[in-house]
């Protein structure tokens, strides 16, 4: 199945001019890698348990009805314990500032973010706005009010 591609205007900010634009790694990739626009001579070090806002050097003009989700890269999480703190971070269609990534280091060692390092994924998705309608009751379901583990952990018979 071939999806229709949208053109999304992007601005490279002065501190990101030499960095590659995000792109899909494979034909079936859902996300595009975002890279760090930290100064080459001053890498960003995130101590264990600390977090930092990492610049990307990019600003987007998303179409109305779309959002960009900033998600972790699984390799950083598995190898270093580094992930996106507010995953998924949301970039609204009316935001025009720099895309930033809040990384947190859950690892045991300091983590160094260097210029051009792939730090997160950006997934573009549609948004459906709703209107909440206050009511006195909700329709019944098999699950009911069960939540937070109410369906169990073990799926073996």
From Swiss-Prot:
The keyword Hydrolase applies. The keyword Metal-binding applies. SUPFAM superfamilies: dUTPase-like (SSF51283). It holds the Pfam family dUTPase. It catalyses: dUTP + H2O = dUMP + diphosphate + H(+). InterPro entries: dUTPase (IPR008181), dUTPase-like (IPR029054), dUTPase-like_sf (IPR036157), dUTPase_trimeric (IPR033704). Its cofactor is Mg(2+). Pathway: Pyrimidine metabolism; dUMP biosynthesis; dUMP from dCTP (dUTP route): step 2/2. Its EC number is 3.6.1.23. Substrate binds at residues 73-75, 86, 90-92. NCBIfam families: dut (TIGR00576), PRK00601.1 (NF001862). This is Deoxyuridine 5'-triphosphate nucleotidohydrolase. It comes from Azorhizobium caulinodans (strain ATCC 43989 / DSM 5975 / JCM 20966 / LMG 6465 / NBRC 14845 / NCIMB 13405 / ORS 571). The gene is dut.
């Amino acid at each position: 199945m071939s999806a229709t591609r949208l053109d999304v205007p992007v601005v490279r900010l002065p501190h990101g001019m030499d960095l590659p634009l995000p792109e899909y790694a494979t034909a079936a990739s859902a996300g595009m890698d975002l890279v760090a626009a930290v100064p080459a001579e001053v890498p960003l070090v995130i101590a264990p348990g600390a977090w930092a806002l990492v610049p990307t050097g990019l600003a987007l003009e998303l179409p109305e009805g779309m959002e960009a989700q900033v998600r972790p890269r699984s390799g950083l999480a598995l190898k270093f314990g580094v992930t996106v703190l507010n995953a998924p971070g949301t970039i609204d269609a009316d935001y025009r500032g720099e895309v930033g990534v809040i990384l947190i280091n859950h690892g045991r060692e300091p983590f160094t973010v260097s210029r051009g390092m792939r730090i997160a994924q950006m997934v573009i998705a549609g948004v459906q706005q709703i209107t909440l309608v206050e009511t006195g009751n909700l329709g019944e379901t098999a699950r009911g009010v069960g939540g937070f583990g109410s369906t169990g952990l073990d799926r073996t018979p």
